[in-house]
Amino acid sequence: MMTREVHAFVYSALPSRVIFGAGRRADVAAELARLGCARPLIVTTHDQRMLGEALAHPFRDASLFSDATMHTPWEVTQRALHEIGRTRADCVIAIGGGSSIGLSKALALQTDLPQIVLPTTYAGSEVTPIIGETRDGEKRTQRTPKVLPEVVIYDVELTLSLPLAMSVASGLNAIAHAVEALYAEDRNPITSMMAEEAIASLAKALPDIAHTSDSIDARRLAQYGAWLGGTCLGMVGMGLHHKICHVLGGTFDLPHAQTHAVMLAHVVAYNAAAAPHAMTSIARALHTKDAWSGLHDLAKSLGAPLSLAALGMPEAGIDHALELVMRNAYSNPRAPEARALRIMLERAWKGLPPATAD
């Protein structure tokens, strides 16, 4: 007979309303009315401006801001705040990935306006109370319920045009959320179950997307996994992996999802001996012998980037990155050790497989 042990824990459910299903972007009007809003500012990126325009079309008093960009630069937030003042917007609707959602959160932080978010990637930011903003060349992250969207609409049809390379990187980013939830200091049985399900769902969906990129079933499963992974991250603290990715992205302007894709297996290998139960859960979800090799092999099989050099990070930047990572490091199963982290960053820069030994 299998025995189970449950220790003391704290579980706080997130307050966002989640709507999931194909075609559910049609619910935006009803959700606006439910929130008592009529003048939305729709935020998106330049590349997804047409999606924003289509979303704005039915609303007489909607306005559009399409300058969202990576890592939520404060200068962009200031311009969007000016647009809110000019149009007297009473809510924010974000359509897009982490750039659009990050800007929406930044606006909510400054204004307390309600948010409706329609994700088009698997980043998961839409269900976390976490915001990262870049000022003076450094990305700073904080956790506050003020940035949680009131409504999240997962419409799988919005992900069908997501290019394969971005689908892969974004999906691995979502897996990273779930992985870190499994060894978070404040983890609990609920988030651990959700995290393992997220990893398993994404590990099944991403190869299917790589084979048939317009598969509704595969895209739906990936979106489901991304929701679970993001939700886990929203409920527990971030670890070393997210600290490193925020440092690398904010300092060297590296693409967010791709940086996660490169670093994930390396950080898991770094933490392996200190988090054996998490390693077992990850390997079980991946159907592999060990967690770090399974994650590396998955990324490699999907054609994901494997080196920081390929993303544009200079080798000379490793020292500066290490200094920033060691400063105010997040809670992590294994304490940050400068020598071991340097070796890890060097291997990640070169695109070598992860290694558990110092």
Where are these regions (language model features)?
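C-terminal charged capping/lid subdomain of soluble metabolic enzymes
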Residues: 5, 285-358
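Solvent-exposed alpha-helices and their adjacent loops that cap or buttress functional pockets
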Residues: 10-12, 34-35, 84-87, 108-110, ...
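Short glycine/serine/threonine-rich phosphate/pyrophosphate-binding segments
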Residues: 25-29, 48-52, 74, 99-106, ...
